[in-house]
């Protein structure tokens, strides 16, 4: 068949040319071409009138006339059925601009529906004649317009300062390109790769976790960022709390682990180290903007929390807060403010959720409870209500001491702050954390839908007392008593019924002030595990649903059972926590950029404790300008050193030594030799004097007598020095320098009269008085000024040695790095 001439004509079939011709007619026609002309063209094409040679081509007209020619039946090859179907489907009849075939019409509409054509919403009809396609496009455009209107309405409801900004389209299909030039966008054209905002990060699309905004903040798109520039913390702090440095990176570095040790709705906690002592690790509490908070409100809220925490930091049961610093944007955190705080080992909740907590003795649990109560009492004594007390906000130090933290919603409870004679300021609104929030506060919970007649102002001090009682019940029962402290919780209703039944049938005076009769017994579910009715009295009185009869902190500390609880730490003990150093400051507002230059005429030793007086250096090095103005001024200063004890002139250090006569040099050399011979005598004298001073300052059982003797005879130390200097001897290299016999006898007598003892290490030191401390905080208590011979022995508690059989608990996964 290859040699047949007719077959060659079949091979030269101009089907491609026919399709090109049809395409040119479609695109060159007007937008409203008459359908009859198109139908005619199709018929002409189908009948083969426009073809040069197509004797074997079948008719593609829809009428069925004009079948195969006689020449095609003579030697034409057979056509496959699929080819016939394909050619028959190509028979197009344009009626109203739509495809006549039902199947092809459905396929085309489905293709348009899922197509992402950027020119789909163009105002000019690129396809020309199609009205069906345009109608589908109009419907899609209407749907997208409605979605954009809804998005604009949601942005207005957010009430942010950038809500009125033009919103980006959600897809390329909804964007218009009529008169726009294509501009390079480094952030991509995908709506998920939204351009990061300088003020807010919550407007970013979170459909994909790996968008560009993930690298611009902590990974949580709900975190809002402060606008630049970040305010100076010193502008919001009182004069006695202003800081030498306000930048985090000046004196601190992030921990290499780069793992947060805690996070909440308004903050995140990470580890930082001192730039000068890598062993000194602290906690950085990075503060975040919440809800619809403006930057000004954020600064006021954070500065208020810092002032309250700083004001309470001089107590052993309060977590020390050192500095309020500006945090830059790094790979660890976003820009903003942050606190430098004392780092805790664990929190109380982590201890309570351990499997070995149920086996902890009651006296150790009561010890922890009393420590928390002492911290709350200290806050109330200083005019501050915590208002968010819960086990998660009680940190445990490495010595096993409970420390309160998180003063984010704390407030002064007096009408006039710092005026303790002013009345108590009541509060309104829902604050705190259920179930530690009392019933009078739960009435303000919008989710409970309580009527306004129940929403009355409440006392914030009673709120702390209730939380303390629920915490004690949780510590003893190893489970939270109820979820919410309101009548919508079945277990709380059961607690209220039990409370009323105990008062009505067993102890009618249970709520009376000063009544210390036994509390509920084992017949009540929330009192069964106490094993002590006096302990249940404390817990139930603190958790009284009625705030009018609830235990106050004064009532608690007057309770006989509470007074008998032994603790391993006293509230007046010193808390030896190293204060981080601030050696460098890059702030240009209030301080010099050079950390070595003092901000005033006298060098100031900056301290983080506002209650300590600032120490000033008595002498300041002269500048080159002062030396040039008064070169003849000579300031004599004595330099005390173990190797050099000569007197020199400050004014002679500028190169005048080279012009001295040789005779004067010889005299000075002779003086130096004499000084060297007497160096060891003076070293012994200074060491002995230092030892005497240190021993006199340390507490002893007879420290009162020592102070009396010193007050009556102020020349005691002068006599000791004179005895040492009476007969100096030449030191030898074979052994220590012997003291004169007379001087030694007098010194021994004087030392025995003053009951002085030689200083020995704390580990081998034996006191004549009873042991003052042997607990986990013994290193901090030894040598404390509060130690006296009449003080009772402290108990030994190992609060951090609670066993845990579960190695990885989901609830503490964020705290494993501690």
Curated annotation (Swiss-Prot):
Essential determinant for high-affinity spermidine transport. Required for the activation of the plasma membrane proton pump PMA1 via phosphorylation of 'Ser-899'. InterPro entries: Kinase-like_dom_sf, Prot_kinase_dom, Protein_kinase_ATP_BS, Ser/Thr_kinase_AS. The keyword Cell membrane does not apply. This is Serine/threonine-protein kinase PTK2/STK2. Residues 57-81, 727-736, 768-789 have a biased composition (Low complexity). Its main location: nucleus. One of its GO terms (cellular component) is nucleus. Belongs to the protein kinase superfamily. Ser/Thr protein kinase family. One of its GO terms (molecular function) is protein serine kinase activity. It catalyses: L-seryl-[protein] + ATP = O-phospho-L-seryl-[protein] + ADP + H(+); L-threonyl-[protein] + ATP = O-phospho-L-threonyl-[protein] + ADP + H(+). Coiled coil: none annotated. Keywords: ATP-binding, Cytoplasm, Kinase, Nucleotide-binding, Nucleus, Phosphoprotein, Serine/threonine-protein kinase, Transferase. It is an enzyme of class 2 (transferase). It comes from Saccharomyces cerevisiae (strain ATCC 204508 / S288c) (Baker's yeast).
């Amino acid at each position: 068949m290859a040699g047949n001439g007719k077959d060659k004509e079949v091979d030269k079939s101009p089907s491609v040319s026919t399709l090109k011709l049809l395409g040119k007619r479609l695109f060159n026609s007007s937008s409203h071409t008459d359908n009859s002309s198109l139908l005619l063209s199709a018929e002409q094409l189908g009948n083969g009138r426009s073809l040069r040679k197509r004797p074997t081509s079948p008719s593609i007209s829809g009428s069925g006339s004009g079948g195969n020619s006689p020449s095609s039946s003579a030697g034409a090859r057979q056509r496959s059925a699929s080819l016939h179907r394909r050619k028959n489907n190509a028979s197009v009849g344009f009626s109203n601009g739509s495809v006549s075939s039902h199947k092809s019409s459905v396929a085309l509409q489905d293709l348009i529906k899922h197509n992402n054509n950027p020119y789909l919403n163009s105002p000019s009809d690129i396809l020309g004649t199609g009205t069906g396609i345009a109608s589908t496009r109009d419907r899609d455009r209407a749907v997208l317009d409605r979605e954009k209107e809804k998005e604009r309405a949601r942005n207005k409801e957010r009430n942010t300062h950038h809500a009125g900004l033009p919103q980006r389209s959600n897809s390329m299909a909804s964007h218009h390109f009529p008169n726009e030039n294509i501009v390079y966008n480094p952030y991509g054209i995908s709506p998920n790769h939204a351009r990061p905002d300088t003020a807010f990060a919550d407007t970013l699309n979170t459909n994909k976790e790996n968008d560009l905004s993930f690298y611009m903040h902590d990974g949580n798109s709900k975190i809002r960022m402060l606008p630049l520039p970040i305010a100076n913390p010193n502008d919001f702090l009182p004069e006695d709390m202003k800081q030498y440095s306000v930048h985090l990176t000046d004196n601190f570095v992030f921990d290499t682990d780069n793992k947060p040790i805690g996070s909440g709705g308004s903050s995140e906690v990470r580890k930082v180290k001192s730039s000068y002592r890598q062993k000194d690790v602290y906690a950085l509490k990075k503060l975040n903007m919440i809800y619809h908070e403006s930057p000004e409100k954020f600064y006021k809220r954070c500065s208020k929390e810092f002032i309250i925490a700083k004001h309470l930091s001089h107590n052993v049961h309060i977590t020390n807060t050192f500095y309020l610093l500006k945090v830059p944007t790094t790979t660890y955190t976003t820009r903003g403010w942050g606190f430098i705080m004392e780092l805790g080992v664990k929190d109380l909740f982590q201890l309570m959720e351990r499997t070995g907590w149920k086996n902890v003795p009651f006296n150790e649990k009561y010890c922890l409870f009393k420590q928390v109560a002492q911290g709350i009492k200290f806050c109330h004594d200083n005019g501050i209500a915590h208002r968010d007390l819960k086990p998660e906000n009680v940190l445990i130090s490495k010595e096993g001491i409970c420390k309160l933290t998180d003063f984010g919603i704390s407030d002064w409870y007096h009408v006039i702050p710092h005026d303790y004679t002013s009345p108590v300021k009541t509060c309104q609104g829902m604050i705190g954390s259920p179930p530690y929030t009392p019933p009078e506060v739960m009435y303000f919970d919008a989710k409970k839908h309580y009527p306004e007649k129940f929403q009355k102002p409440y006392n914030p001090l009673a709120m702390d007392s209730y939380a303390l009682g629920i915490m004690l019940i949780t510590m003893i029962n190893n489970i939270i008593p109820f979820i919410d402290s309101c009548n919508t919780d079945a277990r709380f209703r059961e607690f209220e019924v039990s409370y009323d039944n105990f008062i009505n049938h067993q102890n009618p005076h249970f709520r009376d002030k000063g009544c210390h009769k036994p509390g509920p017994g084992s017949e009540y579910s929330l009192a069964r595990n106490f094993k002590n009715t006096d302990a249940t009295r404390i817990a139930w009185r603190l958790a009284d649903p009625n705030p009018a009869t609830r235990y106050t902190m004064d009532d608690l500390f007057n309770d006989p059972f509470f007074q008998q609880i032994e603790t391993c730490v006293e509230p007046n003990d010193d808390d030896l926590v190293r204060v981080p150093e601030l050696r460098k400051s890059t702030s240009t507002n209030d301080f010099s950029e050079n950390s070595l230059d003092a901000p005033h005429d006298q060098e100031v030793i900056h301290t983080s404790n506002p209650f300590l007086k600032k120490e000033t250096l008595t002498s300041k090095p002269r500048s080159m300008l002062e030396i040039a103005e008064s070169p003849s001024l000579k300031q004599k200063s004595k330099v005390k050193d173990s190797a050099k004890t000569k007197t020199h002139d400050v004014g002679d250090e500028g190169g005048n030594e080279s012009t001295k006569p040789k005779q004067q040099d010889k005299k000075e050399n002779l003086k130096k030799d004499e000084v060297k011979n007497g160096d060891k005598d003076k070293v012994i004298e200074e060491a002995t004097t230092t030892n005497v001073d240190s021993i006199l300052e340390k507490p002893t059982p007879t420290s009162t007598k020592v102070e009396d003797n010193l007050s009556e005879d102020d020349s005691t130390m002068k006599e000791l020095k004179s005895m040492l200097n009476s007969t100096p001897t030449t030191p030898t290299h074979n052994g220590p320098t012997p003291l004169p016999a007379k001087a030694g006898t007098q010194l021994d007598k004087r030392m025995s009269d003053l009951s002085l003892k030689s200083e020995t290490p704390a580990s081998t030191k034996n006191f004549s008085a009873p042991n003052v401390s042997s607990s986990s905080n013994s290193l901090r208590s030894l040598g404390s000024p509060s130690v006296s011979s009449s003080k009772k022995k402290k108990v030994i508690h190992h609060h951090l040695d609670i066993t845990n059989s579960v190695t990885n608990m989901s609830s503490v996964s964020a705290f494993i790095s501690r």
